């Protein structure tokens, strides 16, 4: 893998993993365009590192909320003293607990990482990605256009968290966007767009980190991976940088708009994947 290819792939995935357009689908499409072998150990290690980089971007962006959630739950466990007298359950404590429960359905999904690898190494992968990108875009378009949610982030429920977490299992398939699916569920259940975007963003952190760790252990590149360490470091850094700034822009824009427009992006990527499939057939 060249430095140019690593730069393009890391930056693109750092952006598309944050947006509701399927980072895995874009990674495979761009790898095919750039001639990067997706079955090589270096590519699998690189994919893991850009996944970890995107997760790190989420930690950096949501660092205040993460610290508040961690602190309040440590207070609950008696490991920290409360800052002052508190009435009721602090919101950060409850949000942290909801985030924990939303992560539970992702555990079996991480074990299905091998399924994604087998799909990506098949002959009809581009066609599968094209179909799934269309489906992901269609769901997001319909739900975000029809939803009239009014509930803010303080009103999110355990059912919201569990449902949004469960639907993330489908994102193991390349072309199905984790963000699009979780946003669609949260919007469909009555959350306002800004609340859905924030909770989906927080949910992405353990999802990215967990997937990155599993993929890193699953990549069997040995010495080849060690020799490509500069590319892996570059991938981590670029995906983290791109992911952080994408989070800033995305959360600001979605405070005033609906995410339905990203469906057109997914459909455009689906057309490109289909063209590549037909050309290579």
Task: Indicate residue ranges for each PLM-predicted region.
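Multi-pass membrane proteins that catalyze or facilitate reactions on polyprenyl-/lipid-phosphate substrates
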Residues: 1-281
